[in-house]
C-alpha cells in the first residue's frame, strides 16, 4: 500500500462502530462477560428501566404519573407474537447520547437518561435533580411524539466540522480522535451546503489508492496512488451522496421521520432562520433515542411486540424480487479476499455486508467502518487474506482494546420481535441486521453441533485462527440458541424500521425506504 492514512494510535483509540465500548443505555452491560451475555439473551427485548417510583412521590401529581409509568414498566415490552402489525401506536419520544457520534460532538437531548441514571445510583441527590426528571417525563407525556419539535432533541456542544482543504489523513484522524463516524466538510466557515465525510469516503479513497476504482480526475488519481496529500473536499465527491437535507429546529419529528425513513442517513438541524447548523440528527441516533425511551410510551408496545414477519419488513421471499418495503440482501463468500468485500460495499453503496459460507450460512459481518483496520501499510496483507480471517482479526483486536472477548450478534429471525431487533441494532451500533432461517426445534433441543462452522456465529469461534475447529467451551442451551445462526434469507435496516414508523404513525404514508438509494448516482469528476 502506497500511503499511510492512520495515526499510530488509531488501532488503540478506536472502538468498532458495530460493537460498543459502553452499552449501558442499550441494556447490554459490559462490566463482565457473564453479565453481558445474560443481558443480551434474557433482557434484549426489554427497554431500559424508568426511574424507580420512590423518586417521584414528592407530590400527588408525581405519584399519579409514576403509577401509570410503573404499570407500563411492569408489562415491559414483552414479546407477544399475537399482536398484529395493524395494531395502533400513537406516541413516542426520543432521547440518547452515543459513544460513537454520527456527526460532530452533538448531543441529542440527554436530560431524561442522565437524570434517570443519577437518581437511580445516587439517592442523596438534590431535589432539583428529581424535579428535572419529573418535568422531563411530564413534558414528554403531554404531547404526541409526532409534534415534538427538533429543538427539544438537540443540544449544541462543540459541533465538530473540518475544512475541505485539509487532507484525507487529517479528516480520518479527526474521526478517530472524537470517536465519530462522519464529519461535516465546509468549503468555508459557516457553509450551509456542506457534504459529510464518512467511512464510505475513506473506503473509496483506499480503493482509489489500490487502483481498484477509477475517477475522471487524473490528478487526484495520481496523487492518491503516489501517496501525496489529497484534500478531503475532493474525496467526498467520489462517493454518491444524497442532497444535504436541512430542517429548522421548529420542525417536528413527523417531518424528519419522513426523510430518514426514505433512506437518508442524517439531517442537519438549523436555527429558525436556517442560517446556522445547530446539530445533526442521524438514523442511528433516532433509533437509539426511540429505544431508550420506549417504556415511557406504552402505545408503542403492539408495534414493538410484532414480529418482522408480521410487519412485512426485512424478510425476503427467495423466489421473488425485493419490493419497495424490503432491502436487498448483499453477501460475500467467507473465502473471498477482503478487498473484494470492500469493493462490493463501495459498488453497492451499503454500510455493511454479510459473510456467508458455501451453503449460504451466515458466518459474520463486515462493516464499512472496519476499513480503519486496514489503513496502515503494515495491515496491507489483510486486504488479500480471506473475509473469514479478517473477522477473526477484528474480534481479537476488539478483545485487546476492550480487555475482554467480544461477541456481537448481527442476526435475527423472521419471528424476532421488532423490540429485539431494535435492541440488537442499538447494542451493536449497526445500521442493519441479517435475517437467518430459525434453527430446527430438534437442533435446539438436542444441541446438535455437527457443523459448528455454520451453525454457530463466528463471533463465538473466529477468535481461533482455525475456523474449522470446534470451540472448546460449550455454551448453555440458552446462549447456544441466541448465538446460533443459519441460512441468510434477509436483512433489516434502520431505514426499514424508520419507514414503517413513518407509514404507520405519520402522514408520510408513501415513504419508500429505497428512494434515497435510487437518488445516489455516480458522480463524474
UniProtKB/Swiss-Prot annotation:
The keyword Nucleus applies. InterPro entries: AMPK_gamma/SDS23_families, CBS_dom, CBS_dom_sf, Ssd23. Residues 1-34 have a biased composition (Low complexity). Its main location: cytoplasm. One of its GO terms (cellular component) is cytoplasm. Residues 154-215, 238-296, 323-382, 439-508 form the CBS domain. Residues 1-81, 438-475 are annotated as: Disordered. The keyword Ubl conjugation does not apply. SUPFAM superfamilies: CBS-domain pair. SMART domains: CBS. It is found in: Cytoplasm; Nucleus. Keywords: CBS domain, Cytoplasm, Nucleus, Repeat. Residues 59-73, 443-458, 466-475 have a biased composition (Polar residues). GO terms for molecular function: protein serine/threonine phosphatase inhibitor activity. One of its GO terms (biological process) is regulation of mitotic metaphase/anaphase transition. It comes from the Eukaryota. Involved in DNA replication and cell separation. Belongs to the SDS23 family. This is Protein SDS23.
Amino acid at each position: 500500500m502506497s500511503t499511510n492514512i492512520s495515526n499510530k494510535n488509531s488501532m488503540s483509540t478506536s472502538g468498532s462502530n458495530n460493537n460498543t465500548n459502553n452499552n449501558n443505555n442499550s441494556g447490554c452491560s459490559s462490566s463482565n462477560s457473564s453479565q453481558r451475555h445474560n443481558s443480551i439473551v434474557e433482557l434484549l427485548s426489554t427497554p431500559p428501566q424508568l426511574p424507580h417510583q420512590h423518586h417521584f412521590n414528592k407530590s400527588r401529581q408525581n405519584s399519579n404519573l409514576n403509577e401509570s409509568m410503573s404499570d407500563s414498566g411492569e408489562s415491559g415490552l414483552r414479546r407477544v407474537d399475537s399482536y398484529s402489525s395493524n395494531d395502533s401506536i400513537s406516541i413516542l419520544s426520543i432521547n440518547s447520547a452515543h459513544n460513537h457520534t454520527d456527526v460532530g460532538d452533538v448531543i441529542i437531548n440527554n436530560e431524561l437518561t442522565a437524570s434517570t441514571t443519577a437518581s437511580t445510583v445516587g439517592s442523596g441527590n438534590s431535589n432539583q435533580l428529581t424535579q428535572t426528571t419529573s418535568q422531563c417525563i411530564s413534558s414528554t407525556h403531554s404531547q404526541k411524539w409526532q409534534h415534538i419539535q427538533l429543538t427539544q432533541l438537540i443540544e449544541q456542544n462543540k459541533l465538530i466540522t473540518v475544512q475541505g482543504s485539509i487532507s484525507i489523513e487529517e479528516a480520518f484522524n479527526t474521526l478517530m480522535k472524537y470517536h465519530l463516524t462522519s464529519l461535516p466538510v465546509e468549503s468555508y466557515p459557516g457553509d450551509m451546503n456542506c457534504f459529510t465525510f464518512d467511512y464510505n469516503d475513506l473506503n473509496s479513497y483506499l480503493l482509489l489508492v489500490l487502483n481498484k476504482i477509477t475517477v475522471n480526475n487524473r490528478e487526484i488519481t495520481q496523487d492518491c496512488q503516489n501517496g501525496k496529500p489529497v484534500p478531503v473536499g475532493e474525496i467526498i465527491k467520489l462517493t454518491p451522496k444524497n442532497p444535504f437535507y436541512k430542517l429548522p429546529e421548529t420542525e417536528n419529528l413527523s417531518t424528519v421521520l419522513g426523510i430518514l425513513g426514505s433512506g437518508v442517513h442524517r439531517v442537519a438541524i438549523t436555527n429558525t432562520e436556517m442560517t446556522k447548523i445547530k446539530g445533526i440528527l442521524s438514523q442511528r441516533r433516532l433509533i437509539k433515542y426511540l429505544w431508550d425511551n420506549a417504556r415511557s410510551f406504552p402505545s408503542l408496545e403492539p408495534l414493538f411486540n410484532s414480529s418482522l414477519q408480521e410487519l412485512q419488513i426485512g424478510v425476503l421471499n427467495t423466489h421473488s424480487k425485493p419490493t419497495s418495503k424490503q432491502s436487498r440482501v448483499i453477501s460475500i463468500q467467507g473465502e473471498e479476499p477482503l478487498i473484494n468485500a470492500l469493493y462490493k460495499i463501495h459498488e453497492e453503496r451499503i454500510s455493511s455486508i454479510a459473510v456467508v459460507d458455501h451453503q449460504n450460512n451466515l458466518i459474520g459481518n463486515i462493516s464499512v467502518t472496519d476499513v480503519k483496520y486496514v489503513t496502515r501499510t503494515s495491515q496491507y496483507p489483510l486486504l488479500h487474506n480471506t473475509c473469514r480471517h479478517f473477522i477473526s482479526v477484528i474480534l481479537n483486536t476488539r478483545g485487546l482494546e476492550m480487555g475482554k472477548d467480544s461477541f456481537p450478534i448481527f442476526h435475527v429471525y423472521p419471528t424476532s420481535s421488532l423490540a429485539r431487533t431494535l435492541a440488537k441494532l442499538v447494542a451493536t451500533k449497526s445500521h442493519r441486521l441479517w435475517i437467518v432461517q430459525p434453527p430446527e426445534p430438534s437442533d435446539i433441543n438436542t444441541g446438535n453441533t455437527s457443523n459448528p462452522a455454520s451453525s454457530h456465529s463466528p463471533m463465538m469461534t473466529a477468535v481461533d485462527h482455525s475456523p474449522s475447529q470446534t470451540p472448546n467451551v460449550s455454551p448453555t442451551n440458552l446462549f447456544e440458541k441466541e448465538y446460533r445462526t443459519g441460512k441468510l434469507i434477509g436483512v433489516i435496516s434502520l431505514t426499514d424500521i424508520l419507514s414503517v414508523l413513518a407509514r404507520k404513525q405519520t402522514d408520510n404514508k408513501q415513504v419508500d425506504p429505497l428512494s434515497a438509494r435510487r437518488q445516489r448516482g455516480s458522480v463524474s469528476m
